[in-house]
Amino acid sequence: MSAELKQKLMFLGICLAAVSLLYGRTLAGDFVFDDRGIVEHQALLSNLNQLDKMLTLPYWTEEAGLYRPITLASYTFNYLLFGSGPAGFHFVNLLLHALTGFLIYLLVDKLFKRRLLAYLTALIFLLLPIHSEAVANIIGRAEILALLFSLLAFLSLLKEPQPNQGGLNLKNYWPAGVWLFLAIGSKETAIAALPIAAVMIYAKEKIFWSRENFYKYLPAAAWSAAGLAAYFGLRFLVLGGEYFLKSVTSMVENPLQFVSAGPRIITALNILALYFKKSFWPLGLCSDYSYNQLPVLHNFFNAGTLIGLAVLSLAVVGVFLVRRAPIISLAAAIFLFGFLPTANLFFPTGTIMGERLAYFPSLGFSLLLAYGLNEIFKFRGKIMAKYLAVGLFAALAVFYGAVSFLRAGDWLTEKRLFASAAGCAPLSVLSRSNLGASYYLAGDLVNAKKELLAAREIYDGYPKGINNLGLVYWKEGDLKTARELFLKALSFKFPYYGAYENLALISLEEGKVKEARLWLMLLYSGDKATADNYVEAYLNAE
């Protein structure tokens, strides 16, 4: 084994150890929050024979405008390798996060030939607490896979071309297209890999255009185009024209879908400043920013928006420093292009803000921070500069590591997560409603009702929260109010269909079997046999 290979394997071990130390406790965690989608689709995801069907399925719902077959396929392999328990899913997330850090090291080292910079970038990335949601929340795997496969595409792109009888063999460059397809098939935000790759090539070649570079990278570009065509072709077939480029969501997930461009951009810039702040100073991390935790802003001249504009402007300027400062340019490009697909600046997306969305762009932040530490460390003739750089990194490692470790604990159970979310997002209808639901499940009707009424005060349009409040009234014996709330939960554009079952159960409780069957027929899309079996099982259990 060569010394080079030993060194790489040793650093891979360091990455695995760091991730295990920070997030190992999540192996004891449950399926929480959005992870429930994995459990609800277990019959499909756990069946290897259904793998081809996943290529024709949207990511949970068609209206969301999401198509992520690679992420869905990863859940299938998870079921096959580690069973249906959450520990196996958490283990794979940890493994993928560590591998992503290792690939970051390989990329930075290959591109800039600066090993210390590569070490620092990878370690800072692994330590950043803003990644806790993407790593500890199983559903955050989409973020990890999108970056991981993008890194593999970049590494494939940077391979030295191999001549073939005086020309270039197109077959040698197929990995670039495959990795890009897998990246975008994991999450759409990996489209950012394209402009980042352009900046990367410029940083490597030190020239914007030449005939030699054109032919050098043409095969990889051709395969990348093929990968894109394959993904977008499948996306169109699955989502159709209506949702191909559009995400339809509710006011709860993203109120910016329901305002004009001006307030949307003003608010989005304020949110960009929040992302930047929480990447560097990760106190007050939160799993939820739903309505109305981040109110829509209408005044451009507020501190958050102006800071966000400054961050955006500096990132744009930084990209154009590619000739004079290629490392800064690449860091700016990753940060800028990594954020734009989810930033709500040019178009509204499916969510107003989520810390998991910082996973890809935070690589740019990590590279920039590592560059600063590296420059201090190599300051000539100043031994104190080296001590300062080491001290700063050690302080960051302890600070970021401690916050990441503590934050990972919030994701162990839904009760802990929802309590944490209600504390950091007290104005979110989703957080207050979820906390109320956790109290309800624990049998604490007083606090459940208090939280669910508080959620309704924030926004009387969240169907699941209204349904949960109906459950509380049902438990209290107020069937009239419970029935009214269940019906209200079904009256929205995005109804909560579980309310049909609750209405059926109330009817059965009152002895109205025929009425219960009607509600169940609506729940099961007219499937009379399933409705009859449900009623029969209920009556036999009495």
Language-model features and meaning:
Residues 377, 487, 517-520, 535-539:
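Residue-level detector of alpha-helical secondary structure
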Residues 1-475, 498, 502:
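Polytopic membrane enzymes that build or remodel cell-surface glycoconjugates and lipids
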Residues 423, 453-457, 487-491, 522-525:
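Conserved structural position within tetratricopeptide repeats
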Residues 429-430, 463-464, 495-499, 525-537:
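Boundary/linker segments of alpha-helical solenoid repeat arrays
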Residues 501, 505-530:
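TPR/TPR-like (Sel1-like) alpha-helical repeat modules
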Residues 438, 472, 506, 523, ...:
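TPR/TPR-like alpha-solenoid repeats
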